[in-house]
Amino acid sequence: MGIEGVLKEGFITTSADKLINWSKTGSLWPMTFGLACCAVEMMHAGAARYDIDRFGMLFRPSPRQSDLMIVAGTLCNKMAPALRRVYDQMAEPRWVLSMGSCANGGGYYHYSYSVVRGCDRIVPVDVYVPGCPPTAEALLYGILQLQAKIRRENTIAR
């Protein structure tokens, strides 16, 4: 059924899963957890050239108001409990995007005693964005991949 059928018939048919997942993908509110230089690229994604707002995203300062955590940068052992605490404060459904080599696996500091070798050891990660630092385009691509993953989820159990 095309748009002509919608205008003529006056209604749209879809499944509840598709409708719910569409609304989730169009209103992701990320909470920034910028730990190092990757956070600068995250700021570029929010600026006028890349305009992350066009995806319905609005950066939130509080974990209680957000459903996406973008971990950007080197995660040290002292910061790991704070990352977990912030993740636990986020409401369900929640997603985590790991941005950059340091957040993905420790990066250049992988063998340091004070660095966590990947934020996936602390919180479950949904999408990894590689690079050192990854560009704003790579972050936007990772967000698009997360939106595709959300669209494939089954919200209502069958």
From Swiss-Prot:
<keyword id="KW-0520">NAD</keyword>
<keyword id="KW-1278">Translocase</keyword>
<keyword id="KW-0411">Iron-sulfur</keyword>
<keyword id="KW-0004">4Fe-4S</keyword>
<dbReference type="InterPro" id="IPR006137">
    <property type="entry name" value="NADH_UbQ_OxRdtase-like_20kDa"/>
</dbReference>
<dbReference type="GO" id="GO:0048038">
    <property type="term" value="F:quinone binding"/>
</dbReference>
<keyword id="KW-0997">Cell inner membrane</keyword>
<dbReference type="GO" id="GO:0008137">
    <property type="term" value="F:NADH dehydrogenase (ubiquinone) activity"/>
</dbReference>
<dbReference type="GO" id="GO:0009060">
    <property type="term" value="P:aerobic respiration"/>
</dbReference>
<dbReference type="GO" id="GO:0015990">
    <property type="term" value="P:electron transport coupled proton transport"/>
</dbReference>
<keyword id="KW-0830">Ubiquinone</keyword>
<comment type="similarity">
    <text>Belongs to the complex I 20 kDa subunit family.</text>
</comment>
<comment type="subunit">
    <text>NDH-1 is composed of 14 different subunits. Subunits NuoB, C, D, E, F, and G constitute the peripheral sector of the complex.</text>
</comment>
<protein>
    <recommendedName>
        <fullName>NADH-quinone oxidoreductase subunit B</fullName>
        <ecNumber>7.1.1.-</ecNumber>
    </recommendedName>
</protein>
<comment type="function">
    <text>NDH-1 shuttles electrons from NADH, via FMN and iron-sulfur (Fe-S) centers, to quinones in the respiratory chain. Couples the redox reaction to proton translocation (for every two electrons transferred, four hydrogen ions are translocated across the cytoplasmic membrane), and thus conserves the redox energy in a proton gradient.</text>
</comment>
<feature type="binding site">
    <location>
        <position position="38"/>
    </location>
    <ligand>
        <name>[4Fe-4S] cluster</name>
    </ligand>
</feature>
<dbReference type="GO" id="GO:0050136">
    <property type="term" value="F:NADH:ubiquinone reductase (non-electrogenic) activity"/>
</dbReference>
<keyword id="KW-0479">Metal-binding</keyword>
<dbReference type="GO" id="GO:0051539">
    <property type="term" value="F:4 iron, 4 sulfur cluster binding"/>
</dbReference>
<keyword id="KW-1003">Cell membrane</keyword>
<dbReference type="GO" id="GO:0045271">
    <property type="term" value="C:respiratory chain complex I"/>
</dbReference>
<keyword id="KW-0472">Membrane</keyword>
<dbReference type="GO" id="GO:0005886">
    <property type="term" value="C:plasma membrane"/>
</dbReference>
<dbReference type="Pfam" id="PF01058">
    <property type="entry name" value="Oxidored_q6"/>
</dbReference>
<keyword id="KW-0813">Transport</keyword>
<keyword id="KW-0874">Quinone</keyword>
<dbReference type="InterPro" id="IPR006138">
    <property type="entry name" value="NADH_UQ_OxRdtase_20Kd_su"/>
</dbReference>
<feature type="binding site">
    <location>
        <position position="37"/>
    </location>
    <ligand>
        <name>[4Fe-4S] cluster</name>
    </ligand>
</feature>
<feature type="binding site">
    <location>
        <position position="102"/>
    </location>
    <ligand>
        <name>[4Fe-4S] cluster</name>
    </ligand>
</feature>
<feature type="binding site">
    <location>
        <position position="132"/>
    </location>
    <ligand>
        <name>[4Fe-4S] cluster</name>
    </ligand>
</feature>
<keyword id="KW-0408">Iron</keyword>
<dbReference type="GO" id="GO:0005506">
    <property type="term" value="F:iron ion binding"/>
</dbReference>
